[in-house]
Amino acid sequence: MFVSYKWLQEYVNLDGMTPEILAEKITRSGIEVEGIEYKGEGIKGVVIGHVLEREQHPNADKLNKCLVDIGEEEPVQIICGAPNVDKGQKVAVATVGAVLPGNFKIKKAKLRGEASNGMICSLQELGIQGKLVPKEYAEGIFVFPGDAETGADALQSLALDDAVLELGLTPNRADAMNMLGVAYEVAAILGREVKLPETAYQAGAEKAADYISVKIEDPEANPLYAAKIIKDVKIGPSPLWMQTKLINAGIRPHNNVVDVTNFVLLEYGQPLHAFDYDRFGSKEVVIRKAYENETITTLDEQERTLTTEHLVITNGSSPQAVAGVMGGAESEVREDTATVLLEAAYFNGQTVRKASKDLGLRSESSVRFEKGIDPARVRLAAERAADLISRYAGGTVLEGTVEENHLDIKENVIRLSVDKVTKVLGMSISKEEMVNIFERLGFAVEDAERELVVTVPSRRGDIAIEEDLIEEVARLYGYDNIPSTLPEVTGFAGGLTPYQDKRRKVRRFLEGAGLSQAITYSLTNDKKATAYALEKSFKTILSLPMSEERSVLRHSLLPNLLDSVAYNLARQADSAAFYEIGSVFLKAEEHTKPVEKEHVAGAVTGLWHKNLWQGEKKPVDFFVVKGIVEGLLEKLGITEGIEFAQSERKELHPGRTANILHNGSLVGFIGQLHPSVEKELDLSDTYVFELDLHELLRLDVPEITYTPIPKYPSVTRDIALVVDKQTTAGQLEDVIKTAGGKWLKEVHVFDVYEGEHMEEGKKSVAFSLQYLNPEQTLTEEEVTKVHDQVLKALEDKYQAVLRG
């Protein structure tokens, strides 16, 4: 919102306030002033001149020799190339010694042999943007009204001695998107009165209702529509003071009728539209939803195709405007317009936003409807515009306003607890001070003992609850005046929750094992969403995704993690080892919200140990990654009930995949990528794992207890078993641990053999078993007895035979 300092002075006394001081006070009250632009800054020496004579330059077809009175003793000769310069005009003259934008200095000169003592200026040459210059002066010099004083300061007449404050309004402060709204705010800050504009036209004898009727077909989209009729208008330029206000606000002047509607828009925040009554096509205004594929040519000369979601203003048959967005070219005000149909309405913001977005049209009007206007100002703005049109276009306002109204405008009444203000702000503010603040804001206040009953005017739609009033008290009292205090709290030792502590252990262990942390998007595409999922789930699809690649919430961490691995390998990395701790999103039923669960996943490829001087290089394999997972589970104290069971997953290599079970429940998986997946990602020999961290970190695990170093020696026995190929080492190990009892302290595989001298369908698995009694030395007989129990259990369960 651009706010003219000089225009603001018409509504609020700004004595003692420079633009800088005012900007600081506004900012400290909660509305940020993003900048101050001083119009005409650096320009000097420009006056209003009177062209006494104009004749063709004797030596140049496109130059004019002008004699110009600039308010000095003698007129000066100026050579001017503007095509529209003429005798009798009042123009802007940069005198000799003047400075124009860009530090351009005016000097005496000779142009094609003729002296030129100054320069007749266009508005662009005075620093005004070309898009804001009225069309009739776009290609030439600007001409002042005939009553402009010769020799007067041209910058002052063009409001180029003004300062414009740019306000950075938050979405809730739509009330400040107009001059009166800013005036109320500034008056409240400074403790001064607001001077409201007066309306004083004399209505004609004829009644507006005899010329027009109003019918609303969709009260929800358009609850209020008011129309006024102004006859016998004369279309021409608007007064200079109005044009300069529009230009400084960033709006291009057009004519006295259109400029009035834009002026009132800026003044009241109420969008208006003026139709040419005679071109409107009927004596009724019907506001309805457009028909499918109905068309309208808007004021920008573009044909727009409408849908049934767009609200239009019609003459009963054809659209004449897109409600709240832009008028139609068919009934626009033109030079020969004699009667004006003036529209003031309240349109639903969502309806306007929909049409504005669909049609690619965004206007000053649509922005205000979208953010919300004050319904109480609809009629006030219509009256103000009618008064200005009758004053500056010479028209007669017909008696009455024709309207259809479905609005019940009520002011919001809120009860404010004085004690709550003290509690929220952390300091005591007297009731009298609060009353003063609300009255400065223009709110009505009633005293009710420990409460204040505050009536909020409809212009402040952002104030709805008690906390909003407390914010107003804080703003106007001054945030700088509220003392800083530290909260009184009882000291206590901080720390991590058990879950956080375990989560940190996971991260530290994996990083210690050589994996680097990655963080990937929680969103993926439809194809990848369900890949590698630990459990079945319906997809959670975004309604308005930014891209198809980020349209579905993930069920697994691996798809995006593998993309990161592939990305790194494609950039000359020979190995990659990544892990991620993040959320997956699962839902058991389609039309429910997803449950967010934390998982940990890893992906490793390439060399685990590079070729060093003391040994050969070692590539990553299944058992490297399995060892990482086992070490992680052990770090978390989860050593009992864990089983790696061979399984199949379509994304993983058959025969090199295992589910990870805890007491029979699936908590994760491990495996090598399927060759087809590796080919698709341009990877080779890549191993992955994923664990349900949400479940694992909530398991009750036994506390670690101290065990002294054994005093007595252990006994080691090695066994090589011949078993079926389908029997896993893990299955054999489980039997050994169960049968070995309390004296079996350690068991591990040290050899697996398949090949020559081995029966078809068989393999040899060799284990090393360590027996230990912490209380005494085990005898040979005791060890043999337990060892035989182990062998018998293996034979009974898996028909294991000692290899000879």
From Swiss-Prot:
Domain of life of the native organism: Bacteria
Biological process, per Gene Ontology: phenylalanyl-tRNA aminoacylation
Alphabetical UniProt keywords: Aminoacyl-tRNA synthetase, ATP-binding, Cytoplasm, Ligase, Magnesium, Metal-binding, Nucleotide-binding, Protein biosynthesis, RNA-binding, tRNA-binding
InterPro entries in UniProt: aa-tRNA-synth_II/BPL/LPL, B3/B4_tRNA-bd, DNA-bd_dom_put_sf, Fdx_antiC-bd, Fdx_antiC-bd_sf, NA-bd_OB-fold, Phe-tRNA-ligase_IIc_bsu, Phe-tRNA-ligase_IIc_bsu_bact
Location in the cell: Cytoplasm
Cofactor detail note: Binds 2 magnesium ions per tetramer.
Entry-linked PANTHER family: PHENYLALANINE--TRNA LIGASE BETA SUBUNIT (PTHR10947:SF0), PHENYLALANYL-TRNA SYNTHETASE BETA CHAIN AND LEUCINE-RICH REPEAT-CONTAINING PROTEIN 47 (PTHR10947)
Quaternary structure and partners: Tetramer of two alpha and two beta subunits.
Protein name, per record: Phenylalanine--tRNA ligase beta subunit
Organism: Bacillus licheniformis (strain ATCC 14580 / DSM 13 / JCM 2505 / CCUG 7422 / NBRC 12200 / NCIMB 9375 / NCTC 10341 / NRRL NRS-1264 / Gibson 46)
Species classification: Bacteria, Bacillati, Bacillota, Bacilli, Bacillales
